[in-house]
Amino acid sequence: MILSFKKLYLTFARSSRIIITLVIIDQLTKWWFINNLRWKPGLTLKVTSFLNMVYTWNYGISFGLMRDYYQYSNIVFLITNTIIVCYLYYLMMSSKTIGGFAGYSFVIGGAIGNLIDRSFRGAVFDFIHFYYQDYSFPVFNLADCFITLGVIILVEDYYSAKKNIEEKAKENYDKAQIEAMAEKIRNAPQGDNDKI
């Protein structure tokens, strides 16, 4: 289905506002923590009994994977992430649901936030650290939160759409069954009692 120019423009304008807002929030929080933690190496700001703010650079991908191959992988990450963002933007523009639109906007906003870090700083800045007793979750940032939230929205949207399709299919099946029975009754030969 081809989108009208007006609908395409409105979708682009709305998505751009959401994405730019998420990128600004991500970059401002990173800027603040970089500027307030970098002069204090090893400093951990204890926020609660399970949350710290720390100064960490991630040279790999999610959860620090592939950080040992940084010199080879950074350009590959940049190219791959750019292609993925473009493809996600295409999917978002094709989305027919608010959940799809919102989910893709969050994923794209988070991905662009981390892409900016990798492009201009050579690594992604992470600062949020959750832990509980001996368990420690990998350090992450707001862009990662946006991506995760976007994926959750997309999964929920997918299952809602699937449920709606199944309900409509059942409803259409039931209607077809009723119409078939009514047609049988209309076409059934009339008995002798009806001739009176």
From Swiss-Prot:
Transmembrane spans: 75-95, 97-117, 135-155
UniProt-listed Enzyme Commission number(s): 3.4.23.36
Domain of life, source organism: Bacteria
Keyword Ubl conjugation appears in the UniProt entry: no
Keyword Cell membrane: yes
Family classification: Belongs to the peptidase A8 family.
NCBIfam families, per the entry: lspA (TIGR00077)
Function statement: This protein specifically catalyzes the removal of signal peptides from prolipoproteins.
Protein name per UniProt: Lipoprotein signal peptidase
